[in-house]
């Protein structure tokens, strides 16, 4: 299976995971390790500047050097707030990597396309590696790519909804047109949905809620790992074409012509 490249960095896993909603830090760490993810997100709103080393959840991730910690700006409502949060994250966590989230609507948490694009342009100018969470809008994704985004991260469904790939047709267009990795972010609620995204040609998926709220998060993390691997392998193997009519896999012609 091909490795994933983002901003010149190689990732052996195409499953990214989040750290929210877990019942404990122990359970979160166990699930992350079971997932074999190499990119793990953490919300900036829970990072206390100057006391990062005392944060149990962050330390559980940073003690595994093979994992890249990806701070996210969840909770900001504008480009201005996102830029401030990004600079604080860079100071606190010593990283230029950033998952950009700008969603002013607290009910549906849908990303603001205008503020996201504005923030991306400025953050790229400041040297950040920006992975923006966006609506599944092919035109917006091209603008973000042109602005210097390292990936585009279109949603499958609203954050935490577990509703799957409700935007699949737009995602297909984004994958077809994109020259940067496409990471499906938000809404994936089952391993089968992650596999479908990978079969479509997505470069990676990000999963949090579906793992964290499962009765057995560690086993669910393993299931997502296997599903992502299977979906990617199927994509690389090239799926057969879809037909409207039946086609026998073992034609009877020779058998019927036997003398």
UniProtKB/Swiss-Prot annotation:
It is found in: Cytoplasm. GO terms for cellular component: cytoplasm. InterPro entries: Aldolase_TIM, Thiazole_synthase_ThiG, ThiG. Pfam families: ThiG (PF05690). Pathway: Cofactor biosynthesis; thiamine diphosphate biosynthesis. GO terms for molecular function: thiazole synthase activity. Its EC number is 2.8.1.10. Keywords: Cytoplasm, Schiff base, Thiamine biosynthesis, Transferase. It catalyses: [ThiS sulfur-carrier protein]-C-terminal-Gly-aminoethanethioate + 2-iminoacetate + 1-deoxy-D-xylulose 5-phosphate = [ThiS sulfur-carrier protein]-C-terminal Gly-Gly + 2-[(2R,5Z)-2-carboxy-4-methylthiazol-5(2H)-ylidene]ethyl phosphate + 2 H2O + H(+). 1-deoxy-D-xylulose 5-phosphate binds at residues 160, 186-187, 208-209. It comes from the Bacteria. Catalyzes the rearrangement of 1-deoxy-D-xylulose 5-phosphate (DXP) to produce the thiazole phosphate moiety of thiamine. Sulfur is provided by the thiocarboxylate moiety of the carrier protein ThiS. In vitro, sulfur can be provided by H(2)S. Homotetramer. Forms heterodimers with either ThiH or ThiS. PANTHER family: THIAZOLE SYNTHASE. This is Thiazole synthase. The gene is thiG.
């Amino acid at each position: 299976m091909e490795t994933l490249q983002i901003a010149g960095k190689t990732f052996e896993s195409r499953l990214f995971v989040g750290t929210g909603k877990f019942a404990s830090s122990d359970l979160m760490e166990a699930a992350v390790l079971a997932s074999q993810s190499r990119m793990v997100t953490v919300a900036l709103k829970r990072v206390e500047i100057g006391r990062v080393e005392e944060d149990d959840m962050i330390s559980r991730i940073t003690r595994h050097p093979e994992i890249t910690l990806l701070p996210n700006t969840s909770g900001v409502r504008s480009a201005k707030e996102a830029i401030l949060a990004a600079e604080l994250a860079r100071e606190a966590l010593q990283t230029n990597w950033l998952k950009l989230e700008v969603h002013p609507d607290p009910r549906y948490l849908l990303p603001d396309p205008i503020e996201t694009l504005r923030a991306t342009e400025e953050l790229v100018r400041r040297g950040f590696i920006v992975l923006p969470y966006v609506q599944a809008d092919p035109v917006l994704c091209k603008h973000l790519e042109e602005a210097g985004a390292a990936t585009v991260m279109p949603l499958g469904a609203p954050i935490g909804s577990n509703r799957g790939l409700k935007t699949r047709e737009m995602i297909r267009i984004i994958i077809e047109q994109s020259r940067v990795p496409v990471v499906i972010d938000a809404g994936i609620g089952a391993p089968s949905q992650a596999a479908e995204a990978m079969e479509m040609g997505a470069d990676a998926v990000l999963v949090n809620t579906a793992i964290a709220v499962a009765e057995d998060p560690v086993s669910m993390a393993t299931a997502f790992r296997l599903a992502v691997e299977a979906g990617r392998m199927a994509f690389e193997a090239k799926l057969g074409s879809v037909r409207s009519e039946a086609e026998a896999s073992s034609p009877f012609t020779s058998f019927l012509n036997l003398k």
